[in-house]
Amino acid sequence: MPVLTPAALAAALPLSIGDLALAQPNPPPTVVEDERLLAYVQPGQLVDIGGRRINLHCMGAGSPTVILVAGSGSWSPIWYKVQPVIAQKTRVCAFDRAGFGFSDPAPHFQILSDVADDLHAALSAGSIPEPYVLVGHSLGGIEVRLYAQRWPKQVAGMVLVDTSPAGEGLIEQNQPGFDAAYGGVASNTTPLLDCAFLAAKGPLDPSSPEHKDCIPTLPSDAPNAFRKIFPQFFTAYYFADRVSLMSSLDSHRYDSVDQRHLGAMPLVVLSPETTWEFSTPAEARVSRSYEKVWIAMHEALAHLSSRGVHRIIKGSGHHIQLDKPQAVIDAVDEVLRELNKPT
């Protein structure tokens, strides 16, 4: 997961679901609402996993089942441009982490392996049929790779969408100066902790200047029904759990995930043309080398399978599923075609 400057993070919280947010808080009357977001106004299948509920938002029918796991700040609606199209071909379920979207919080703040455990428990309790094609964006890419490492017989293929390499400390090793330029996890989580503190005092109000950096602005065509419920998801647990997830990534405890060979599993790794925008000349200088390292890491991930493919998506930023959704749809289609080939 690329590390943002505190200023950039504060300006774009939360990254991901917040990146649905690009325009005005109140659409003009002439704007036609994007009805695809209405599918996410209510929970899908709320699955009990030991006294708390995990939301699985499923569409379509068929096998294998495609499982969508969002990045660190997102939940099901981040896939609104992708999921309905995939559902025309097979069953596809978007997963909300504990405390994200309509899922209940966990009894403690989670680390990445906890999320993989929750996903496994939810798919089992929800009777979601195997095999699975796992699609993970950003931090979700590590979570789906952890899943494949722990339950390999359930996973038929994977699509990794600008995934975080599990050992982001390797970036500093390969590109000295990266941590100094971007501040590392500690400084980049400060805005999240500030938002957690505000949310702990009461519901956040998107019209409040004090809260505006914590709740992103939705796109102008977001339906009013979605706009109405959106602020309720930004709880103190949500912000604090994001810090916990990011900090667990920085601990290097998941480095081995990027080293497990996947045999002949169909695998597509997607990289953006531009990962982040940079606000200072120092960041820009580091970014040129940093992005080369990031792309090289993605290329190495693709080589973990004899049927791995790596693609750079022109015209896309970090959120390829929003910027270039067809690229994600095509990648899933490619994995499905590979699985349907005679053996």
Task: Briefly describe each language-model feature range.
Residues 174-300:
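Alpha/beta-hydrolase
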Residues 17-66, 88-90, 109, 117, ...:
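Alpha/beta-hydrolase fold catalytic core
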Residues 52-102:
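Conserved HGGG/HGGXW glycine-rich cap/lid loop of the alpha/beta-hydrolase fold
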Residues 306-343:
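Catalytic active-site module of serine/aspartate enzymes centered on a nucleophile-bearing elbow/loop
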Residues 6-18:
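Bacterial N-terminal signal peptides
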Residues 97-135, 151, 177:
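Active-site loop/oxyanion-hole signature of alpha/beta-hydrolase fold enzymes
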